[in-house]
């Protein structure tokens, strides 16, 4: 027990060799709101020349709190006062009473990583992990000294961020959004706007009708579920896409990108370590990160690389059964289709098999379908909702209880509007009660950004034939699509032509996930540098060519195999040639 | 134990009176991707006329999953098959093995509210609660039949959503955002754009410079911490606002509104029931909702109504000590200044006293300062950051460890851009390590909406004297400000002139939180209707006048007292007169 009163001296432990000088205390008196001489419960006794000099230095030290404290301690020892560090812990959450008088106190310690929610510490998100962070450092270095590296720019192939790589936004979208932001333009004479050649008539009309749906301003909160008129557009889009299988606006939630939808769904179903969520390996690490935050279990099911990263339903069922045996409830099953990072697109049969397992075990399915507009020739996308409805028709009673949440986003496709945060989820088989719970969660974040909601409307209702923007819009889409295909195929063929790297043929999405078969010497050097072999390859690739990718470990892979994920969004084919040269040199250097 | 094989019949319990007919199973074979005749592991045996007729009815029933199942069961009993309901639970998480052959299975039950994360079920957010939901119903009713109610429109005084109530956005902001959305406009000849009288020159220039900061497109993901150039603007704004106390861009995080910042901060520090977060009562219910989601404890500290809802530091310290005694760690202290719902603005002394407690106990302070631009004449806003720096200067060593997160938003002030989701937090006293943890959390959501980030830049760097938009921008701001003041004062004076309702004088924010002293008869009727008295008053108010408010219980209040929160955003003064009439009639009806 310690007691302190004004002017007492005491020794707490041997490590404190200085005597603590007490502070004079003045009671707080009310005062005018004049700054900066406020009276507070205490004042310092020191006003030495050293302190005055020190105060000038302080702003620089304030940058890092720990430096600041070190500097303060230094100052205190300069002035003969003892370090308070050793005492601080006493005041933190004292189990004993520090009897204070006149409001003197010892400042408690800061909160540190030790105080942070462990779930947050555990969560990892590699897409913006170590290699991309290194790329940022190199980018900054190039800005200072453009000649200092063997390349002149960083190519961010680590993230599906098309417009960062000079992909142009679709003109129609941006005309509409521009008009929504500045409705004064809509008060102008339509013909004058059209004659200015800045806005097309159909864009003007769409902006006006959207403005009505929205209620008059993109600056007002909308309903938390999203603007009703836009949800109707989404439902119509889904119905048409799914060959007439009806979708209802009540089942649609507009969200700030698909990531927000994942967040809601996992918040709702994750109850802690006894909850299991099946995720494909390799996966998009949003899922494992969110599971870590929710302190729930990831149940990985491996995709089969050799058959184009296909999904194996027996694998899924095995994982489910094992979870049950381990008393973990396999509550949710995540399917990413088209796959990220794999680029695989599921056949109707695969989807049906997945639903069998879901129906049998009562597992909610999350269908992450954000890449459904990124499909390569020769492949057809079938939505999981459509297949579910077919199964329900064909096999009455078997699939009626299946609960499915299907996600889409304006970040991908050919629009690539990642920074606008538009998306939606469609809930199938969720009761009104369950939807109300999700609505409540959504209401705590108030509403998704309204311009993002508008963008969803544009995505699901693009210009149609006969409308003024149709032809140019089609031309823009085709151009982007063709370039993506060309780059994807070039990269794919390049990988397969080189030794030590092979790749499954992409069917969709924006990524390749090649397997790297590193020579033993390279693996040794990686270990020496305390990197995994895939990190090592990615690091070398970055430092030689400026191409930033993400090691396969960020997505999960069969133990003993090494991959990396790259996008094929960067314009041109030059960077692919650079990669090819680098790879050959790398293997020349490390070949056994 | 049950075993099933093809064509077996069995009875499970007395309640199953029908015999289960087995299904023929066909092994899945690969097939062309032709729809809809996919082969699946099993097929139904039924294809009766009744079923075909039923299928036409099905789309309507699909709307509600439970109706769908009922319909299916009905169909099955029509065709002589027994209900599968009673068997479903067996397959859910079977502890025994259901030996199946040929992939037949019984569908498991759906997940229901019983399976939902309890924390989500517990969370409440009253701002969009029962009374506002009733208002939405009445709104829909008015759309169908405008004469059916004693009022012609709903006035949403329940939410701080200015642009929903015809407050116009600031022209300068919207010109810049419009240009950012459609950069083609920036490629035009500047003079021509100006001559069109649609865009002012300073808006064009700002859009160009922001576009450079952003990196070329609002459609690309930005860095997760937010565009660097915009963070610099924020740091400069804070430094200037705080009389030269330096703010650093590294300490700034741009966020999707202040709500996202609260979400990050509480995720990081909430570790479960042993974590306590002090919140003011009354509070903005985002805090209690988020605490419920994080399964941590709210530690309420009561604001003092009779002294204008001031903060009592002794009350705060008492709450802290009690928490410690109950083995709850008082980790975070939330201060809402200006207050929501109270409208109170803290004096420098009050702030200093709050920091004393924080410094003494090592509690992180969240300063929710989103209403700092909504200050009434005669009141001055002092940021908590500024006061902290003063305390650190005046009392070296005492306050060095204090950790503070200060929040701001583009949703309030005179811009009222709620739907655009712009905001920031400034971290003071957080080490680099701690900032990295927050950065990681932010990266899981990728980035805040980029146009919202741009709006933050506009908020902290409005047009200045000499620039083309300055005068009109000032005029717009003053006009909005004056109208807000007029309505606030009118409402305040009206409340205080009536019996049974009294109100503290607002110093800032967008709300009044009057206390209602209901007559006993009214309290009785409320209880009869199973409503709290404040809900009852709000419901009556809504149904008589269309004015939608939020009962005080949504924000917290001293037990035995009743309040409601209303905004003063609705245009004009007519609705205030309506309220006055309603209140007099209400008291005439219920007076003892």
From Swiss-Prot, chains A, B:
Keywords: Aminotransferase, Mitochondrion, Phosphoprotein, Pyridoxal phosphate, Transferase, Transit peptide. Present with 9960 molecules/cell in log phase SD medium. GO terms for cellular component: mitochondrial matrix; mitochondrion. CDD domains: AAT_like. This is Alanine aminotransferase, mitochondrial. It comes from the Eukaryota. The keyword S-adenosyl-L-methionine does not apply. The modification N6-(pyridoxal phosphate)lysine is found at residue 412. Its EC number is 2.6.1.2. Its main location: mitochondrion.
């Amino acid at each position: 027990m310690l007691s302190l009163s004004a002017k007492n001296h005491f020794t707490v432990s041997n490590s404190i060799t200085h005597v603590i000088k007490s502070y004079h205390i003045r009671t707080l008196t009310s005062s005018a709101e004049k700054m900066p001489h406020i009276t507070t419960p205490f004042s310092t006794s020191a006003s030495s020349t050293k302190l005055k000099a020190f105060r000038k230095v302080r702003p620089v030290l304030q940058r890092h709190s720990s430096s600041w404290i070190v500097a303060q301690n230094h100052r205190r020892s300069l002035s003969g006062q003892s370090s308070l560090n050793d005492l601080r812990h006493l005041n933190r959450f004292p189990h004993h009473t520090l009897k204070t008088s006149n409001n003197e106190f010892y400042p408690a310690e800061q909160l540190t990583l030790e105080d942070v929610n462990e779930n947050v510490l555990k969560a990892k998100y590699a897409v913006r992990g170590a290699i991309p962070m290194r790329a940022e450092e190199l980018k900054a270095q190039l800005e200072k000294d453009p000649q200092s590296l063997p390349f002149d720019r960083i190519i961010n192939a680590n993230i599906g961020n098309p417009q960062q790589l000079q992909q142009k936004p679709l003109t129609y979208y941006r005309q509409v959004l521009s008009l929504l932001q500045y409705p004064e333009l809509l008060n102008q004479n339509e013909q004058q706007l059209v004659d200015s050649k800045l806005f097309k008539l159909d864009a003007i009309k769409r902006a006006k009708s959207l403005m009505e749906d929205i209620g008059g301003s993109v600056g007002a909160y909308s309903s938390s579920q999203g603007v009703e008129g836009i949800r109707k557009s989404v439902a119509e889009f889904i119905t048409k896409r799914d060959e007439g299988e009806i979708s209802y606006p009540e089942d649609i939630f507009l969200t700030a990108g698909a990531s927000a939808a994942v967040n809601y769904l996992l918040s709702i179903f994750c109850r802690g370590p006894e909850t299991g969520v099946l995720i494909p390996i390799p996966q998009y690490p949003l899922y494992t990160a969110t599971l870590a935050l929710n302190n729930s279990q990831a149940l990985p099911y491996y995709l089969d690389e050799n058959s184009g990263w296909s999904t194996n339903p027996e694998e899924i069922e095995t994982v489910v059964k094992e979870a049950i045996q381990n008393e973990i409830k396999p509550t949710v099953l995540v399917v990413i289709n088209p796959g990220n990072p794999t680029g695989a697109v599921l056949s109707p049969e695969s989807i049906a098999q997945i639903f069998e397992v879901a129906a049998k075990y009562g597992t909610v399915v999350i269908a992450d379908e954000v890449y459904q507009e990124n499909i390569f020739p020769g492949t057809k996308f079938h939505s999981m909702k459509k297949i579910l409805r077919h199964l329900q028709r064909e096999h009455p009673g078997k699939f009626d209880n299946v609960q499915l949440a299907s996600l889409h986003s304006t970040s991908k496709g050919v629009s690539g509007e990642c920074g606008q945060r538009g998306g939606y989820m469609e809930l199938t088989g969720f009761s009104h009660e369950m939807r109300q719970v999700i609505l409540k969660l959504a209401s705590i974040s108030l509403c998704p950004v309204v311009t993002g909601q508008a963008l969803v409307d544009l995505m699901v209702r693009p210009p149609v034939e006969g409308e003024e923007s149709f032809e140019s819009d089609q031309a823009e889409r085709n151009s982007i699509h063709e370039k993506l295909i060309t780059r994807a195929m070039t990269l794919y063929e390049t990988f397969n032509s080189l030794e030590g790297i092979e790749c499954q043929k992409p069917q969709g999405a924006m990524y390749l996930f090649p397997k790297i078969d590193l020579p033993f010497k390279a693996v040794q050097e990686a270990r020496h540098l305390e990197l995994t072999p895939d990190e090592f390859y990615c690091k070398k690739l970055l430092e030689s060519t400026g191409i930033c990718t993400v090691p396969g470990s960020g997505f999960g892979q069969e133990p003993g195999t090494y991959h990396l994920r790259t996008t094929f969004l960067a314009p041109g084919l030059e960077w692919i040639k650079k990669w090819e040269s680098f790879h050959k040199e790398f293997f020349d250097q490390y070949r056994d």
